[in-house]
């Protein structure tokens, strides 16, 4: 408890404190329960401050906005580790993600499927859905 008081004195309150050792232990416990063929994904909207800690614990980081994508870019997250999700993806959002090398997207509608397929074909002329 003294440690928390010293953290509050140093950083002020409110202050969020994360135990990365405990986080890693819990993620390893999840990994032991889930079949190896199942990939683990962390949605950074839950807490973008945990990106660095989660990078080594999951195979994929999910982003749902251009802002979250930019945070990952700035933190050096490899594009092949990013899943771009979200129902409000625009053409510009998908193009930017593809420019950065993102290749994994969720499709929430037939419109999204067409949009991503068309843009993927433009980025890779050999691709055709």
Positions of PLM-derived features:
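A charged N-terminal "starter" segment
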Residues: 1-129
